[in-house]
Amino acid sequence: MDPLHTIEKVPARRNIHDRGHQGHRMGDGTPGRPKISVQQMTRFSLIIFFLSAPFVVNASTSNVFLQWAHSYADGLQQGDPCWVCGSLPVTNTMELPWWVSPLQGKDWVFFQSFIGDLKQWTGAQMTGVTRKNISEWPINKTLNEPGHDKPFSVNETRDKVIAFAIPLLDTKVFVQTSRPQNTQYRNGFLQIWDGFIWLTATKGHLSQIAPLCWEQRNHSLDNWPNTTRVMGWIPPGQCRHTILLQQRDLFATDWSQQPGLNWYAPNGTQWLCSPNLWPWLPSGWLGCCTLGIPWAQGRWVKTMEVYPYLPHVVNQGTRAIVHRNDHLPTIFMPSVGLGTVIQHIEALANFTQRALNDSLQSISLMNAEVYYMHEDILQNRMALDILTAAEGGTCALIKTECCVYIPNNSRNISLALEDTCRQIQVISSSALSLHDWIASQFSGRPSWWQKILIVLATLWSVGIALCCGLYFCRMFSQHIPQTHSIIFQQELPLSPPSQEHYQSQRDIFHSNAP
């Protein structure tokens, strides 16, 4: 029979204080349990078994953000697919940033109905519990004010408790145990020992001033050592009214008997003891707390332009993706597009180099760890084989020898690491690229419009140089023909008087001339 069925068979009128105190005896130095009368057995029967069943949401086995996202979408009643976005924790040692809206207005009427349904469900007489009626509370004049309009159900509360308790019930018998310390910090999270499990606190903040808080201070009895548990304290300025609990009040701990009651919050609510948020208050709790509905800020959208799982990777200020504004200059000036491609190729090489360096370091650490584990396992097996040689030990019997096969792949891993190191050296370069050099000159990487200005300035400089070159070439080409013509005119004069002179000379040599 599973533990849940075992719990189901617990009589409804069984006193909760009877759990796990059989080991206390009178006269041996350990405080004994006082004799319980019938009236005392029914005094706190308001707390049924599932209010004291240990349960907690294990952060390692459930994704609280996904649970919140689903509940958020269900609350919006969005039938179509949509994106649900919410704030993430600031650090890895913090949980979701929960806000708590305290119970107010008509919520107290629903809570009073919850107490009445609980009384009918258990069939118990709450004659010993005091201040259980909301008419006795300071908020009795605000019952007509609006609230969260969320009724509380005993059955829903019970189902949620059992759903949380099933994975944590490892044994069929509940035995309440004590610890030397009821408080500890694990991985940065506050934990409280409630007698069965460690309760892990969640961070919560009041979204407004709480209309009503309950405060329980340290008890004056010292018959039950190591039973107090400090849950947290809401500052006085954040509570409009505070009820100082007495011994037998609702939510209080009866210090006349050894504490053994857990006060679970109704479905949809939790106890806020600033800054800690608890699913229930364990026995012997101390602090100032209030009931409220936790919620987290969120929004929903139908479609998203950029999916949240695509990171905007940055390496030395270089973008790893092409921005949409970079496409415009590449259409009119292909040289800019070519420069962008070169830039992102360099960025890809930088990313690859960094990834290989990280992989090299992590695999090196794992290789060293596996090597030492290999040595320890080999030594342990050898020692175990020596002790259990008569029965064959943990080795394989081959004729008269005992053989153990332990694979050792550290050499292969070392070779792979050496090859990775060579690959890193191939793609590594200490020289600055053209883009980085230009960026260093500008004390930062230029944007797309700065690139256009650089290209235009370059084109203007080249154009000026070409114009100047063409001008000097033209001037030089015009100066050379004029120089040659002057030289030829001085050596061979071809003017008309010269022609007549030559003609008269030819006439002298002709004898037949007139």
UniProtKB/Swiss-Prot annotation:
Residue intervals passing through the bilayer: 452-472
Disulfide bridge partners, by residue number: 395-402
Location in the cell: Cell membrane
Region of interest called Surface protein, as start-end residue ranges on this chain: 60-316
Reported modifications of this chain: The CXXC motif is highly conserved across a broad range of retroviral envelope proteins. It is thought to participate in the formation of a labile disulfide bond possibly with the CX6CC motif present in the transmembrane domain.
Glycan-bearing residues: 58, 133, 140, 155, 218, 226, 267, 350, 357, 408, 412
Topology in membrane: Single-pass membrane protein
Extent of motif CX6CC: 395-403
Transmembrane protein: annotated segments: 317-514
Gene3D superfamilies the UniProt entry points to: 1.10.287.210
Site feature (Ancestral cleavage site) residues: 316-317
Tissue: Low expression in placenta and testis.
GO cellular component, one term: plasma membrane
Residue segments, region Fusion peptide: 328-348
Chain ranges for the short sequence motif CXXC as given in the UniProt record: 82-85
Keyword terms, alphabetized: Cell membrane, Disulfide bond, ERV, Glycoprotein, Membrane, Transmembrane, Transmembrane helix, Transposable element
InterPro entries membership: TLV/ENV_coat_polyprotein
Motif CKS-17, residue numbers: 378-394
Function: Retroviral envelope proteins mediate receptor recognition and membrane fusion during early infection. Endogenous envelope proteins may have kept, lost or modified their original function during evolution. This endogenous envelope protein has lost its original fusogenic properties.
Entry comment, domain topic: Contains the CKS-17 immunosuppressive domain present in many retroviral envelope proteins. As a synthetic peptide, it inhibits immune function in vitro and in vivo.
Entry's family note: Belongs to the gamma type-C retroviral envelope protein family. HERV class-I R(b) env subfamily.
Full protein name: Endogenous retrovirus group PABLB member 1 Env polyprotein
Organism lineage string: Eukaryota, Metazoa, Chordata, Craniata, Vertebrata
Gene: ERVPABLB-1
